[in-house]
Structure formats: C-alpha cells, structure tokens
C-alpha cells in the first residue's frame, strides 16, 4: 500500500493537512491508488496538496487545481494542471465535461456559501463511483465564514 503519510513527509511544496485527515483519506481514497484517477482540487495554496495526490495515487494520475490566485500557476507541471479562476464562477464548471473526475476536493475559500455553490456546480463532474470531499467543514460553525452553530446557511446544514 502507498502510505499517504509517508508521501506527505516527502513533499517539496507547502501543504497543510490536519493529522486526523490521513486515516480518513486512506480509507476513502485507497481504492483509486494505481488506477490513474483524475482529481480536481479547489484551492491550490502552496501546491503541496497537488503534489501529494499525484505521488500518492501513482503514475497516470492527473490533478487539476483551481485557484483564483494567479501566482498558483507556477505549480503547474507534468500531470498537474492549474486553472486560475474563482470557485464560484459557474462558466468554469459548466465548460467541463460531465463525469470527468474520480475525486473532487474542495479546499477553497471555506466560506459556507462558496462551499454550497461549488458542490451544486461540480457534482455533475464526479464519476458515478467517485468522491466529493469538502475539507475544513468546521468553518460551518464560524460566523465569519457565513455559518454558526445553528445557522441554516452553513455547509453542514446544507448537506
């Protein structure tokens, strides 16, 4: 088995992952290892997460990163494509073919309304046996991110 934690420790680019995410990732993502999956990750940050997925899933993996920061384009390399755009731009998602990704990871703005809009727009892009993964959903409980403990507008309430 390709250990995700070991791959994380080898990263050359910046990446932040909570420790308790690793066993969850491996539980749900392991079936794609060695199967040349297509991954979409919203939110590029330092490019490390894209590198992590490319190395973890192995040869033939394609990773597409979307970020509104034009500086993220520098993380583009073989098998990693960077699209500079806002995750709430409907045209971006409607131009992509249906069922084009095995895994979609939203690690973008963490703002509840953006998470909800993104799920609604990208769901059609996920293959039937694919996975939609929204990171850092604890922000649903932050008023600053459009949520709150009992907020009907939080991503947690929506899902």
Region locations from a protein language model:
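A short alpha-helical cap/connector motif
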Residues: 1-105, 109-134, 138-159
């Amino acid at each position: 088995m390709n250990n995700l934690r070991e791959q994380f420790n080898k990263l050359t680019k910046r990446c932040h992952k909570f420790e308790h995410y690793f066993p969850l990732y491996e539980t749900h993502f392991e079936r794609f290892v060695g199967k040349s999956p297509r991954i979409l990750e919203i939110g590029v940050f330092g490019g490390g997460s894209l590198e992590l997925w490319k190395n973890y899933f192995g040869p033939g993996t394609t990773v597409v990163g979307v970020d509104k920061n034009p500086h993220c384009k520098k993380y583009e390399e073989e098998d990693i494509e960077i699209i500079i755009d806002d995750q709430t731009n409907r045209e971006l998602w409607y131009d992509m073919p249906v069922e084009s990704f095995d895994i979609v990871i939203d690690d973008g703005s963490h703002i509840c309304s953006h998470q909800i809009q993104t799920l609604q727009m990208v769901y059609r892009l996920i293959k039937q046996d694919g996975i939609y993964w929204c990171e850092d959903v604890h922000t649903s409980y932050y008023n600053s991110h459009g949520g709150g403990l009992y907020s009907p507008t939080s991503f947690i309430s929506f899902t």
